[in-house]
Amino acid sequence: MPTRLTNYFLRTLREDPADAEVTSHRLLVRAGYIRRQAPGVFAWLPLGLRVKAKIERIIREELAAAGAHEVHFPALLPREPYEITGRWEEYGDALFHLKDRKGADYLLAPTHEEAFTLLVKDLYSSYKDLPLTIFQIQDKYRDEARPRAGLLRGREFTMKDAYSFDATDAGLDVSYQAQRDAYERIFARLGLDFVIVQADAGAMGGSRSEEFLHPTPIGEDTFVRSAGGYAANVEAFTTVAPPARPFEGLPSPEVHDTPNAPTIQALVEVANEQSPRPDGRVWTAADTLKNVVLALTHLDGTRELVVVGLPGDREVDLKRAEVAFAPAGVEAATEDDFAANPGLVKGYIGPWSAGGPVLGEEAATGLRFLVDLRVVDGSGWITGANLPGKHVFGLVAGRDFDWDGTVEVAEVKAGDPAPDGSGPVELARGMEIGHVFQLGRKYADALGLTVLDENGKLVTVTMGSYGIGVTRILAIIAEENNDDKGLVWPEAVAPFDVHVVAAGREQVAFDVAEQAVAQLEAVGLDVLYDDRPKVSPGVKFGDAELIGVPRVLVVGRGAAQGEVELWDRRGGNHTTLPLSEAVAALTTSS
């Protein structure tokens, strides 16, 4: 039976929702696909469910072809497994916490590693049961501080999460590649451009980690890529350290008066005025060592200040810092932090003063001093002297100051060398649509998932984790497939195959439209039929364009002669032809 608009639950809107930030949010609400319930929480209406179901069907088909089996877990899970793996604390405020009437702690699951691991532990005990890959498509929950952009960053979202279980690392490599290949097929069928980038595993843990990013200007992620094929999320980018330099012939450090120069820009200006370079070049921000104080909050609640030294032409990238210091939280030091550490002279912080080392666990301040990988033995710097209005010139790393370790927190810039030697990188924006991890034995170790191997010895199972953001994909498809009139869905995920519009006021238009619907359904096409009798053609046309079914068949003025108009929403073509030819054309293109 066709879906008739006279009795379909649908209401389109002429005005954009006030809170819409991106095109997909605006059009999905206006066209009647979703409806906001709370910040980051949406109701799914019939049209939206149809598109979502088609995306899920493609995912299921490709995962089944890769040998995965579908299961379904509850969203409400007990605290204990997450506490055992440490994620109850690691996720922090991002978890939705609940208590039952007896006071027991529960959560709304952000991901299900623990549940999958315990299920396999309960049921499997031998290497003969492996390899195994199981998945679910289910709603997830994260208490986003600032949900935004409609479905792109919500508190409730639908996700496909799959997990592989193998007795050996070699087996994990095979399972991982099978899922990676399946992802490529899924995104190709959905018509999504994607880039596979090296990524950080974050709170998920594990070793090998890759993201599938859809390049888009509204993307939340910055990634880098080189002409030679290197690609990585900025959080996973590895800085190429320059070679160490000899100390011989380098002058001793000198402390200079640099009043009113607490910023890098002011320092460079003063340096070029007071102490021009002997080689005739000008001092730049890259010649200065910026020392930034960061505050770390550890899982036990303790707060630690660390000082990070990096070239002055670089800013601290907080996302990279969060990865570098995980699982601790990271923020800039506050005025109270500086007040509690008078040895740090704000605006003039440096690792060395006339009295000797200042920073480092063995120095007077006792603060850890970590440096960027570009700070190598023999490199000379202009940096703070830990005295108001004073900087030290010619301070040489490895000779005049040491550090407690290196850290990757500096921003990545276009032109930085790729770590694999494939050339300079460029920066781009993208939105994560899929993520594959080799979790290894983190969760199996924590939860005791072992099997007997072929020698009768207990071995810990090694795992992979594979996620796809279903609702995010739907939003991205909407974001990339629209025009000034409304949505234009790709045929693979469109809510219907054909949208038939009875546009005339005479009964003959409705009679011919009924014939068209019957013939289209007879050849297996899924039809949305606008049979509303008291709605003007203009309103019907507007709704058809807004809803975005890519092929529209209009029955109007030519109905009495058996002619209809075929619209190609994507190409913009309108063709008048006999009904039989229109049905044949729609059948051929399906």
From Swiss-Prot:
The keyword Cytoplasm applies. One of its GO terms (molecular function) is ATP binding. Transmembrane segments: none annotated. SUPFAM superfamilies: Class II aaRS ABD-related, Class II aaRS and biotin synthetases, YbaK/ProRS associated domain. The gene is proS. It comes from Leifsonia xyli subsp. xyli (strain CTCB07). Catalyzes the attachment of proline to tRNA(Pro) in a two-step reaction: proline is first activated by ATP to form Pro-AMP and then transferred to the acceptor end of tRNA(Pro). As ProRS can inadvertently accommodate and process non-cognate amino acids such as alanine and cysteine, to avoid such errors it has two additional distinct editing activities against alanine. One activity is designated as 'pretransfer' editing and involves the tRNA(Pro)-independent hydrolysis of activated Ala-AMP. This is Proline--tRNA ligase. Its EC number is 6.1.1.15. Gene3D superfamilies: Anticodon-binding domain, Bira Bifunctional Protein, Domain 2, YbaK/aminoacyl-tRNA synthetase-associated domain.
